From Swiss-Prot:
Organism domain of life: Bacteria
SUPFAM superfamilies: S-adenosyl-L-methionine-dependent methyltransferases, Winged helix' DNA-binding domain
Organism of derivation: Streptomyces peucetius
Subunit structure: Homodimer and homotetramer in equilibrium.
Pfam families the record matches: Dimerisation, Methyltransf_2
Ligand binding (substrate): D163, N257, R303
Pathway: Antibiotic biosynthesis; daunorubicin biosynthesis; Antibiotic biosynthesis; carminomycin biosynthesis
Protein known as: Carminomycin 4-O-methyltransferase DnrK
Residues engaged in binding S-adenosyl-L-methionine: R153, G187, E210, D237, F238, S252
Stated family: Belongs to the class I-like SAM-binding methyltransferase superfamily. Cation-independent O-methyltransferase family.
Lineage start: Bacteria, Bacillati, Actinomycetota, Actinomycetes, Kitasatosporales
CDD domains linked to this entry: AdoMet_MTases
Reactions catalysed, as given in the entry: carminomycin + S-adenosyl-L-methionine = daunorubicin + S-adenosyl-L-homocysteine + H(+)
Cited Gene3D superfamilies: 1.10.287.1350, Vaccinia Virus protein VP39 (3.40.50.150), Winged helix-like DNA-binding domain superfamily/Winged helix DNA-binding domain (1.10.10.10)
Keywords: Antibiotic biosynthesis, Methyltransferase, S-adenosyl-L-methionine, Transferase
Length: 356
């Protein structure tokens, strides 16, 4: 039996209990996501500051909306500026649609990522089986679901591109393109990374390899950017031989979607398509050590498990994957972001025979 706590020990146990309840809460994350989905902060900033006005704007029941708003005040996202009138706090302002941090879309339950986060409700299944849970909720694997839902596909591409600096500009600036003639961006989305390279290095041409559902979006984006003469888009499958050789092959937020054996298959295809002296550039999150318990790293790692069966990799894991594909990690460059609370990395891989 556990001994009865002393009077002196009880406050510490109460604090521990409060911490556990906060960490285990499902209602607070759903309240925040509901506020994002309803665009409450945008409506407030547009002048709808009362429950009645907000209910009219959001097509919700005033009495139910008030209960939501009361919790938003309790957790510090809203405050009562005058009796019955609410305004966002500094934290709440992050849920404005035009905020540079772009958090409203990430928390909107109708958008691709927040919708997929519902997969976490079946996390025990993923831990028992090592397999994703997304399909058990939505009936199709993640990318197959996106392919059949153009709205979700557009949402996903937009979310990945929402931080222009960390998504494209920072990695494009981190590499010397002097000796690169052609870049192949494998799984390159709408072409933002390839476009950033093309703008920075006018002598470089590029090819974006993507699935059918994204090809038209990428072509339209590159045309609007005035780069369609230098960056072409090809429909294809990166498990098959790649459509052409290149001096630099980019994998930006691709391998984290796949378990190790599939990641090795993708890397092997990329290695086959390298021109002599070429390099593979992997743009993702990595962690220095196996025993690093970084909250953002572990959270995204679990998200990849329940969405796709993929994983984030530590430095040791990257070395192992590279070796399995006949490659070596030549260098790693950290890419700090001004708008997200963690750094990303650009890993440079070379054929093992030439790598350092």
């Amino acid at each position: 039996m556990t001994a009865e706590p002393t009077v002196a020990a009880r406050p510490q146990q109460i604090d521990a209990l409060r911490t556990l309840i906060r960490l285990g809460s499902l209602h607070t994350p759903m309240v925040v996501r509901t506020a994002a989905t309803l665009r409450l902060v945008d409506h407030i900033l547009a002048g709808a500051r009362t429950v009645k006005a907000l209910a009219a704007r959001t097509d919700t029941r005033p009495e139910a909306l008030l209960r939501l708003i009361r919790h938003l005040v309790a957790i510090g996202l809203l405050e009562e500026d005058a009796p019955g009138e609410f305004v966002p706090t500094e934290v709440g302002e992050l849920l404005a649609d035009d905020h540079p941090a772009a958090q409203r879309a990430w928390h909107d339950l109708t958008q691709a990522v927040a919708r997929a986060d519902i997969s976490f409700t079946r996390l025990p299944d993923a831990i028992r089986t090592g397999r994703p849970t997304y399909e058990s909720i939505y009936g199709k694997p993640f990318y197959e679901d996106l392919a059949g839902r153009p709205d979700l596909r557009a949402s996903f591409d937009s979310l990945l591109a929402c931080d222009q600096d960390v998504a494209f500009d920072a990695p494009a600036a981190a590499y010397d393109w002097t000796n690169v003639r052609h870049v192949l961006d494998v799984g390159g989305g709408k072409g933002g990374f390839a476009a950033a390279i093309a703008r920075r290095a006018p002598h470089v041409s590029a090819t974006v390899l993507e699935m059918a559902g994204t090809v038209d979006t990428a072509r339209s984006y590159l045309k609007d950017e005035g780069l369609s003469d230098r960056v072409d888009v090809v429909e294809g499958d990166f498990f098959e031989p790649l459509p052409r050789k290149a001096d630099a092959i980019i994998l930006s937020f691709v391998l984290l979607n796949w378990p190790d054996h599939d990641a090795v298959r993708i890397l092997t295809r990329c290695a086959e398509a390298l021109e002599p002296g070429g390099r593979i550039l992997i743009h993702e999150r990595d962690d220095l050590h196996e025993n690093s318990f970084n909250e953002q790293f572990t959270e995204l790692d679990l998200r990849m498990l329940v969405f796709l069966g993929g994983a984030l990799r530590t430095r040791e894991k990257w070395d192992g994957l590279a070796a399995s594909a006949g490659l070596v990690v030549e260098e790693v460059r950290q890419l700090p972001s001004p708008t997200i609370p963690y750094d990303l990395s650009l890993l440079v891989l070379a054929p093992a025979a030439t790598g350092a």
